[in-house]
């Protein structure tokens, strides 16, 4: 089974949204994936999904459960097939954390950055970008 770890700065908005969106898409399309999410930083460790991100998932009909933000570890790097980042900063941080990605597992969700709704407060655009990226990755991996 392919294992995907979505990555953003805090693991409370974009990466966790990508986790639940991808799980939902995979289930609806009969594709078996193991999906999780993590942060590059330690700032939000233990926190649940940011409430506006949770509301957006609920509005779009994406199932989710209680979440505990966590930071990515070397164990994650070794056990996941793909570490998919939301933006260039996430990619730089992961490359620094994981010795410049010797196994070539670090990718970006889209060719462009997914805007961080923590700063922009634009959860609709973030959701649409993440959904677009997850659909493209699901097609690529199916």
Language-model segments: which ranges?
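Conserved active-site segments centered on acidic
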Residues: 1-78, 139-142
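Phosphate-binding/catalytic loops
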Residues: 82, 88-142
């Amino acid at each position: 089974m392919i294992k995907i770890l979505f990555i953003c700065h805090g693991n409370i908005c974009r990466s966790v949204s990508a986790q639940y969106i991808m799980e939902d898409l995979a289930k609806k399309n009969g594709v078996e994936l193991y999906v999780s999410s993590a942060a590059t930083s330690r700032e939000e460790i233990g926190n649940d999904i940011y409430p506006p991100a949770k509301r957006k998932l609920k509005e779009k009909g994406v199932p989710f459960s209680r979440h505990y933000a966590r930071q990515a570890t070397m164990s994650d790097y070794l056990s996941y097939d793909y570490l998919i980042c939301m933006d260039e900063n996430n990619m730089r941080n992961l490359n620094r954390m994981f010795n410049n990605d010797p196994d070539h597992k670090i990718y970006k969700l889209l060719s462009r950055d997914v805007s961080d709704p923590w700063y922009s407060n634009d959860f609709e655009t973030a959701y649409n970008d993440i959904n677009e990226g997850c659909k493209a990755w699901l097609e690529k991996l199916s």
